[in-house]
């Protein structure tokens, strides 16, 4: 299992476009991908769950990846967040 945290930098927070791209990226991996904020954890492969977190600028999210490609998934998803959010 791999886990990392990220503080949202985008002034708009996790909004529709980057949320959709993040979900698409998460779906490209076989591993289970979860995203959590303030103790609420959701499936990162489901757009409504990701949007439902209502993560705004300055909020910390925690990503947990578990499965056969977890190393690659964690690295690529962390890079995605840094580049887009």
For each feature predicted by the language model, list its residue ranges.
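C-terminal structural segments of small proteins and small subunits
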Residues: 51-85
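Intrinsic-disorder/low-complexity, polar/charged segments enriched in Ser/Thr/Lys/Arg/Asp/Glu/Gln
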Residues: 1-5, 60-62
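Compact, glycine-rich, soluble single-domain proteins
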Residues: 8-43, 48, 52-56
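Generic cytosolic/nucleocytoplasmic N-terminal low-complexity/intrinsically disordered segments
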Residues: 1, 36-39, 83
